[in-house]
């Protein structure tokens, strides 16, 4: 069959070809297919004759070989950074500069990068340079200067080593010698001056009163007494204007202003999985301060919702419903402002057990706010790896490009909307999962730079969103910020106790909201890498599998997804569970597609496709930090001690203390099943109960380090 003249073949412009090894470095090779302009045979060398009509009926292509560095030693990576072909591999430099600190310190990299400077000439002696020796024509130095310029521009915080700033001083000295008066030299000089002036101001001035996290927590001496509840209710009422006294627009705009300022200051390096996952290790208290600030703000907003709704137990149901409705309207306004961070924080609080179980209060909520609440909750549904929230964020990011394309010639360009401000936790989880799935080093002590490229794909999205957040035009409103700071925060125990005082368990709806079990870590890892193979536009893993029944410090609570109910009816209540009781989980998972794990890993059964020889179980630790789960693959050969050690490793508890813990299976009805120390867990566990397990310290053993999410 003949092909229509002038019609292009439907071939992929870039096709994988394989790998090549050269001098110990591994390259990925692909073939790039490009259109080529071919001159008609009738056209002379001068181009005076018109091209032949026959020439326009053919499309000419040329295929070029493209090599990108996949793995190499540090010296080779530095050489590629300086002398590599940036047109052929444009992502190498930004990926390297954003992730290099995972495998080499800044000072060490500068030692590789900066060539030694010649000694200064004796006084009165002038050294004449030939054209070859002239620095302006020295290709190597110009390449190094270009790299330093990009480094100073995109990652200036890498050179902040207080108080000496020795790394930045070395860069400034080199640029003053290699490129005096250049933009790069001026940038280094200006950056060093800014760092020194900032240090002087910190020494001379008192630290400003900046709100950096959750306000104080209300406490009572005897939580079971009625007098204590009355005192607690009185203590929870803040002095001065309360947050809900302001309009919906004002509160939503101030929350957006705080979120965008914190998100714009996030350092990309702190988001890397190898950095963020170590934040709770001993000696890492000050690690990732910019990311911690966003987490603290998220938890503060969630705490404000809990405090304002539960902080006045004496309110009647219609009055409490008005507070619920206002928070729903604030959440809707955050959605209109494209602030997904505060939107998720508000929804997480409204969906937490202490608020969600208030049947009478939800029953007094009007139909329209209730419908809005259900629609907003669908944004962060955990189905299909949080596909809904990811697609919405992609659409919001694409808004700017589509508006620019729609501008007609001669018309004024329309101003793109600001933002969006994303929920940073999704990106953090993606990066942690990438760090867990891919090794840092490959065989032969080669740095796995392909892993760094994948991390850069996520960091580049964060960087692009940070730039778009600069287009917001919001002004601070001090009274609202003061009211936000004055809102007392409730502990988890207080939230449950006040909720049960407001509506005793007997008055709660017996039917619990059916919360879909979060997709396991293994499944999301497999899904992400499988989607990357098929080049899906929305292929990135989702949030960690750590459902909680209420707000826990440092990580947002899980969002229960309620079934659709008739308009005007209150959402189903979680029932009368206590603080330590997990919410009931639904096992009706969507049918997953089988995915294959890369890197030669054995196939791990998915939750809906459990094999007869393996199970994916979830293990928590019985402590005061809430129900923090970690997923573990359990095979028919696993004994209790090995399961305990693996679970403690997932929870960042030192391994020598594994003998201090016992493994229990959590059964319905607040019952637990002790797994004997030498038992085969696969056969000792109850096959009909939910596969939730708990580690509990043996009696008489010493206290261990606190456990926190990683």
UniProtKB/Swiss-Prot annotation:
GO cellular component terms listed in the entry, alphabetical order: cytosol; plasma membrane
What residue range is the signal peptide?
Answer: none
SMART domains cross-referenced by the UniProt entry: RA (SM00314), RasGEF (SM00147), RasGEFN (SM00229)
Residue span, Ras-associating domain: 613-700
Superkingdom is: Eukaryota
Give start-end positions of Acidic residues composition bias: 198-207, 397-407
Q: Which GO terms describe its molecular function?
A: guanyl-nucleotide exchange factor activity; small GTPase binding
Query: Keywords of this protein's UniProt record, alphabetized?
Result: Guanine-nucleotide releasing factor, Phosphoprotein
Residue stretches of biased makeup (Low complexity): 535-553, 578-590
Q: Does the keyword Cell division apply?
A: no
Q: Name one GO biological process term.
A: Ras protein signal transduction
Where in this protein does the record say Phosphoserine is found? Answer: 52, 508, 512, 555, 569, 573, 591, 601
Q: Where is the Ras-GEF domain?
A: 247-505
Q: Does the keyword Coiled coil apply?
A: no
Annotated N-terminal Ras-GEF domain residues: 65-200
Biased composition regions of type Pro residues, renumbered to the chain: 568-577
Domain-level remarks: The Ras-associating domain plays a central role in the activation of Ral-A GDP/GTP exchange activity.
Its quaternary organisation is: Interacts with GTP-bound forms of RIT1, HRAS and MRAS.
Name this polypeptide is given: Ral guanine nucleotide dissociation stimulator-like 3
What lineage does the source organism belong to? Answer: Eukaryota, Metazoa, Chordata, Craniata, Vertebrata
């Amino acid at each position: 069959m003949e092909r229509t003249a002038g019609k292009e073949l439907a071939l992929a412009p870039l096709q994988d070809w394989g790998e090549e090894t050269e001098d110990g470095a591994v390259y990925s090779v692909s073939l790039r297919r490009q259109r080529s302009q071919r001159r008609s045979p009738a056209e002379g060398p001068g181009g005076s004759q018109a091209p032949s009509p026959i020439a326009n009926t053919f499309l000419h292509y040329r295929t070029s070989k493209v090599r990108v560095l996949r793995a190499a030693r540090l010296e080779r990576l530095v050489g590629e950074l300086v002398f590599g072909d940036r047109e052929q591999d444009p992502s190498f430099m930004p990926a390297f500069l954003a992730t290099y600190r995972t495998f080499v310190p800044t000072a060490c990299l500068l030692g590789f990068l900066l060539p030694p400077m010649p000694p200064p000439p004796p006084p009165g002696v002038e050294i004449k340079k030939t054209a070859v020796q002239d620095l302006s024509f020295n290709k190597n130095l110009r390449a190094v200067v270009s790299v330093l310029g990009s480094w100073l521009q995109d990652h200036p915080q890498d050179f902040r080593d207080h108080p000496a700033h020795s790394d930045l001083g070395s860069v400034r000295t080199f640029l003053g010698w290699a490129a005096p008066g250049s933009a790069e030299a001026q940038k280094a000089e200006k950056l060093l001056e800014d760092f020194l002036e900032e240090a002087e101001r910190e020494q001379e001035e008192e630290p400003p009163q900046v709100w950096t996290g959750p306000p104080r927590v209300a406490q009572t001496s005897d939580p079971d007494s009625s007098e204590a509840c009355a005192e607690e209710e009185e203590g929870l009422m803040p002095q001065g204007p309360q947050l809900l006294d302001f309009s919906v627009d004002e509160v939503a705009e101030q929350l957006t202003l705080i979120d965008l300022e914190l998100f714009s200051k996030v350092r990309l390096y702190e988001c890397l999985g190898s950095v963020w996952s170590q934040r709770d290790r001993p000696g890492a208290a000050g690690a990732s301060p910019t990311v911690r600030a966003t987490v603290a703000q998220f938890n503060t907003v969630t705490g404000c919702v809990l405090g304002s709704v539960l902080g006045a137990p004496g309110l009647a149901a219609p009055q409490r419903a008005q507070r619920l409705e206002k928070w729903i309207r604030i959440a809707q306004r955050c959605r209109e402002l494209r602030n997904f961070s505060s939107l998720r924080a508000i929804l997480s609080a409204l969906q937490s057990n202490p608020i969600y179980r208030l049947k009478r209060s939800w029953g007094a909520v009007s139909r329209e706010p209730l419908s809005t609440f259900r629609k907003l909750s669908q944004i962060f549904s955990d189905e299909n790896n949080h596909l809904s929230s990811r697609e919405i964020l992609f659409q919001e990011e694409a808004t700017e490009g589509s508006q620019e394309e729609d501008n007609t010639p001669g018309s004024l360009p329309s101003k793109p909307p600001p933002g969006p401000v994303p929920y940073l936790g999704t990106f953090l989880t993606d990066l942690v999962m990438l760090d867990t799935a891919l090794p840092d080093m490959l065989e032969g002590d080669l740095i796995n730079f392909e892993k760094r490229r994948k991390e850069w794909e996520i960091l580049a999205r964060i960087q692009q969103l940070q730039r778009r957040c600069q287009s917001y035009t919001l002004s601070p409103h001090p009274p609202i910020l003061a009211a936000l700071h004055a809102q007392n925060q409730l502990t988890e125990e207080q939230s449950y106790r006040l909720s049960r005082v407001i509506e005793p368990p007997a008055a709660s709806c017996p039917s619990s909201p059916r919360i879909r079990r979060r997709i396991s870590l293994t499944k999301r890892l497999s899904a992400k890498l499988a989607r990357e193979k098929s080049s899906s536009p929305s292929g990135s893993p989702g949030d960690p599998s750590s459902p909680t029944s209420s707000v826990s410090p440092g990580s947002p609570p899980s969002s229960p997804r309620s079934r659709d109910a008739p308009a005007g009816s209150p959402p189903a209540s979680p029932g009368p569970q206590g603080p330590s009781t997990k919410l009931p989980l639904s096992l009706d998972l969507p049918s997953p597609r089988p995915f294959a794990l890369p890197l030669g890993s054995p196939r791990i059964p998915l939750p809906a496709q459990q094999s007869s020889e393996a199970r994916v179980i979830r293990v928590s630790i019985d402590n005061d930090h809430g129900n923090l789960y970690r997923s573990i693959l359990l095979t028919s050969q696993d004994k209790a001690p090995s399961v305990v050690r693996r679970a403690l490793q997932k929870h960042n508890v030192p391994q020598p203390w594994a003998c201090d813990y016992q493994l229990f299976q959590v059964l319905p009805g607040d019952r637990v099943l002790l797994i004997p120390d030498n038992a085969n867990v696969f056969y000792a566990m109850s096959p009909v109960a939910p596969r939730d397990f708990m580690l509990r310290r043996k009696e008489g053993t010493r206290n261990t380090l606190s456990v926190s999410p990683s």
